[in-house]
Amino acid sequence: EFWQEILPLHQNQTILVVAHSCINRCLIQAANNISPAYMQHIQQSNCCINVLNFAGTGNLNEEKVQIESFNQIQHMGEKLPSLRPNHRGIRLLLVRHGETDWNQQSRYQGQIDIPLNVNGKSQSEKVAEFLKEVSIDKAFSSSLLRARETTEIILQHHQGVGLELNDGFKEIIHGLWQGKDEAEIELEFPGELQRWRETPEQLKMPDGESLEQVWQRTIAVYESILNSALNNKLNTVLIVAHGGTN
C-alpha cells in the first residue's frame, strides 16, 4: 500500500525513506514482487543505503523496478556488511569487469573478446584496492579477456589465490547485434532495442541467446562452484563476469 500511495504523488522525484530492517525488507520485496517467505534472504545493516529505480508508471503492478544498489555500508567505514551471527556457508563477491572501448562506445560486445581500456584498468585497480584487505579463498572468472584482466588485477593483492576460468560465465551471445552500436541496431532491427529494454525475457537476438539459455548455463556453473566451495570448506569466493551473467 505504501508504494501505491507514494509513487503517483512523486513522479520523476527522488524519495528518501528511512525505516527499519523488517520494513525495508518488506518494501524491497513488495517493489520487486518477491514472496514474504524470502524475507530472511535480505540483509539490512544499520544505516545501510538501498537505491531502487522505478519506471514511473505510478502503478506498482506495472512497474519495472531496478535495484541499483543494495545494503551499501561503505560510507560507514566498512568494506563489507558483517555476516549474520552463526552464519554458515559461502560469501560470494560478484564483480563485473572494467570498461572496454566498446562499453564506452555503447557497442554490444557479447562474446567478442575485447580487452580493458585505460579507464577499465583504472577501475579494476580501484576494486583491487577496495578488496585488498578482504580475505579471498578462490577466484573464478569468465574466460573472456575483459573479465580475466579485471580478475588478475584484483588478485595482485591476493598472492596464492587460485584463479579458474569458466566459459559458463561468458556474456550473453548478442548474435547479429555484436559489434554494433544502438543506432546501427535500430536501423537494421527497428523496434527490437525497445523490446529488449522493456521485455528482454521475450526477445532472442538474431543468432544470439535467450535470457533463459543464459540463465540455465550460468546457474549450472554457480551450483557447481557452490558445491565445490562447500566441499572444500571455502569461506569467500570471488567471481568476475559480465552484466548479463551477473
Task: List each language-model region with its residue ranges.
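Active-site signature of alpha/beta-hydrolase-fold catalytic machinery across serine-
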Residues: 26-30, 153
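Acidic, low-complexity terminal tails and accessory targeting/binding regions
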Residues: 11-13, 29-96, 104-107, 129-130, ...
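Generic structural signal for well-ordered alpha-helical scaffold segments
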Residues: 3-7, 125-132, 215, 219-230
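Short glycine/proline- and acidic residue-enriched helix-loop micro-motifs
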Residues: 1, 192-213
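Active-site metal-binding loops of divalent metal-dependent hydrolases
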Residues: 21, 73, 98, 243
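Phosphate-coordination/substrate-recognition cap region in phosphate-metabolizing enzymes
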Residues: 1, 125-194
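Short catalytic helix/loop segments, enriched in acidic residues and glycine
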Residues: 112-125
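Short glycine-rich phosphate-binding loop at a beta-alpha junction
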Residues: 14-18, 135-143, 162-166, 231-240
